[in-house]
Amino acid sequence: MFSNIGWGEMMILLVAALVILGPERLPGAVRWTTRSLRQLRDYASGATAQLKEELGPEFDDLRKPLAELNELRGMTPRGLVTKHLLNGDDTVLRDLEKAVPTTADLYGTNSGMPDFPKPKMEKPLARNEHPPIDTDAT
């Protein structure tokens, strides 16, 4: 439920609750919160159990498409191609990866980058010398 709240945030919330409620009312507030969360969880599990009882085997029929949607949500493009176009056989993709050369193969082992000539550095201007003006650029 609180999967994206870290220990630092929990400590800040605890200190804020201590300041706002005070040490006298804090234990009662914690008890009320835990009791409410347990009751909410019981309501949710009771509703799920009641839905299973009323729908019977149809409940499983409802869960199958939802499970398939969840499975598709987590798939990568490669996984989708493998599953639907290649019937789960990804040997074709592995063979294709072996056949296509990588950048390191094309340019040797020097970090995959070709050797480009370094740009020429112009000497600095003399004290009274003006920089060249490009009339086409202005």
From Swiss-Prot:
NCBIfam families: tatB (TIGR01410)
Organism in which the protein naturally occurs: Nocardia farcinica (strain IFM 10152)
Molecular function in Gene Ontology: protein transmembrane transporter activity
GO process annotations (BP): protein transport by the Tat complex
Pfam families cross-referenced by the UniProt entry: TatA_B_E
Role summary: Part of the twin-arginine translocation (Tat) system that transports large folded proteins containing a characteristic twin-arginine motif in their signal peptide across membranes. Together with TatC, TatB is part of a receptor directly interacting with Tat signal peptides. TatB may form an oligomeric binding site that transiently accommodates folded Tat precursor proteins before their translocation.
Gene3D superfamilies: 1.20.5.3310
Bilayer topology annotation: Single-pass membrane protein
Keywords of this entry: Cell membrane, Membrane, Protein transport, Translocation, Transmembrane, Transmembrane helix, Transport
GO CC aspect terms: TAT protein transport complex
Residues that span the membrane, as ranges: 2-22
Biased composition (Basic and acidic residues): 117-138
Statement: the UniProt record of this protein carries the keyword Cytoplasm: no
Protein name: Sec-independent protein translocase protein TatB
Region: Disordered, residue numbers: 104-138
Major localization class: membrane
Intracellular or extracellular location(s): Cell membrane
Family, per entry: Belongs to the TatB family.
Subunit text: The Tat system comprises two distinct complexes: a TatABC complex, containing multiple copies of TatA, TatB and TatC subunits, and a separate TatA complex, containing only TatA subunits. Substrates initially bind to the TatABC complex, which probably triggers association of the separate TatA complex to form the active translocon.
